[in-house]
């Protein structure tokens, strides 16, 4: 069996920053540090931070007074921010800056009283945070659509003042179809100047297409609740290549690889490289040859840390 590795794969700049914020907060202030929602959607990462003293909660009413709280990379609603401020909690915001960009777009449309359509997956924390940026008291409204059927059923009050934004971790191909449907139904709709789907999502989807084209099977390292990891698995399957989403080597079954000559491996943006290495090691034990890394797009984007952690960690 040959092993081919997608490039790029794994951690993006927003995930790197979010994990580092939790680690530095633990270093500087000591445990416990409370984190609202999993800081990133990866079991291995969350378990490691939990062992260091991070406490993960879903709502702020689970957080005692006078503690440090970190908002996850997925972002939070304005209501959550106001609740934290009202309680006087010390907050470090690990929201990915590319998610914050979408939040700012929604706030602007809300302030102008313009209606906004968010393309995204209902129930995902990023979507909940983005929807929660919109203040309908200025006369507008925000609508969530997931697919073309949702667009067909959508009714708005002022199509001449309508905008759309997207969740940052969607399938580019699926999102393009939804945008086309929105433009067909609402010709005056306006989108962001730059695509909201983040650079890392785009790069990893491009890389998995190349990988699936060269392999008999694709393994996507990522947790089941990771949106971008699920999109990678779906994309490989759409290209006709069997694909599995796995948290790590322990999820693999030997029988999957019967008759497989070329195995492709990629990782979602929240999955660390150590998990990929564990998968490779297991495959090598099962007789796979040395891995080959495909050529890909170089990523050199970094995001700065919150000032207080940046100074105190020196």
From Swiss-Prot:
Binding site for dimethylallyl diphosphate: 41, 74, 124, 226-228, 270
Coiled-coil stretches: none
Pathway noted in the entry: Isoprenoid biosynthesis; dimethylallyl diphosphate biosynthesis; dimethylallyl diphosphate from (2E)-4-hydroxy-3-methylbutenyl diphosphate: step 1/1; Isoprenoid biosynthesis; isopentenyl diphosphate biosynthesis via DXP pathway; isopentenyl diphosphate from 1-deoxy-D-xylulose 5-phosphate: step 6/6
Keyword RNA-binding among record annotations: no
Disulfide bonds: none
Cofactors (names): [4Fe-4S] cluster
Record: active site: 126
Entry keywords, A to Z: 4Fe-4S, Iron, Iron-sulfur, Isoprene biosynthesis, Metal-binding, Oxidoreductase
Residues annotated to bind [4Fe-4S] cluster: 12, 96, 198
Binding site residues for isopentenyl diphosphate: 41, 74, 124, 226-228, 270
Gene3D superfamilies the UniProt entry points to: 3.40.50.11270, 4-hydroxy-3-methylbut-2-enyl diphosphate reductase, catalytic domain
Cofactor: record remark: Binds 1 [4Fe-4S] cluster per subunit.
InterPro entries documented for this protein: LytB/IspH
CDD domains registered for this protein in UniProt: lytB_ispH (cd13944)
Family according to the record: Belongs to the IspH family.
Xref: NCBIfam families: ispH_lytB, PRK01045.1-2, PRK01045.1-4
The protein's role, per its UniProt record: Catalyzes the conversion of 1-hydroxy-2-methyl-2-(E)-butenyl 4-diphosphate (HMBPP) into a mixture of isopentenyl diphosphate (IPP) and dimethylallyl diphosphate (DMAPP). Acts in the terminal step of the DOXP/MEP pathway for isoprenoid precursor biosynthesis.
Protein name from the UniProt record: 4-hydroxy-3-methylbut-2-enyl diphosphate reductase
Gene from which this protein is expressed: ispH
């Amino acid at each position: 069996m040959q092993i081919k590795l997608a490039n790029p794969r794994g951690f993006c700049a927003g995930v790197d920053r979010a994990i580092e914020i939790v680690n530095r907060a633990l270093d500087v202030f000591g445990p416990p540090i409370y984190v609202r929602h999993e800081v990133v959607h990866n079991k291995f990462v969350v378990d490691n931070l939990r062992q260091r003293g991070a406490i993960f909660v879903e709502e702020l009413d689970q957080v005692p007074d006078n503690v440090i709280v970190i908002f996850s990379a997925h972002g939070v609603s304005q209501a959550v921010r106001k609740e934290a401020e009202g309680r006087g909690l010390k907050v470090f915001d690990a929201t990915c800056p590319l998610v914050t960009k979408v939040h700012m777009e929604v706030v602007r449309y809300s302030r102008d009283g313009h209606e906004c359509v968010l393309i995204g997956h209902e129930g995902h924390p990023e979507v909940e945070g983005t929807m929660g940026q919109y203040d309908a008291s200025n006369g507008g409204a925000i609508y969530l659509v997931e697919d073309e059927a949702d667009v067909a059923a959508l009714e708005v009050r002022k199509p001449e003042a309508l905008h759309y934004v997207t969740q940052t971790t969607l399938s580019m191909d699926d999102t393009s179809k939804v945008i086309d449907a929105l433009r067909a139904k609402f010709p005056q709709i306006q989108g962001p100047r730059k695509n909201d789907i983040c650079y890392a999502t785009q790069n990893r989807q491009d890389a998995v297409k190349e990988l699936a084209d060269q392999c008999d099977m694709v393994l996507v390292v990522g947790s089941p609740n990771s949106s971008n990891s699920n999109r990678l698995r779906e994309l490989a399957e759409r290209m006709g290549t069997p694909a599995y989403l796995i948290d790590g080597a322990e999820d693999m079954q030997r029988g999957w690889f019967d008759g497989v000559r070329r195995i492709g491996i990629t990782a979602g943006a929240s999955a660390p490289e150590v998990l990929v290495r564990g998968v490779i090691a297991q495959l090598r034990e099962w007789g796979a040859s040395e891995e080959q890394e495909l050529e890909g797009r170089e990523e050199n984007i970094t995001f700065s840390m919150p000032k207080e952690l940046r100074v105190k960690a020196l």
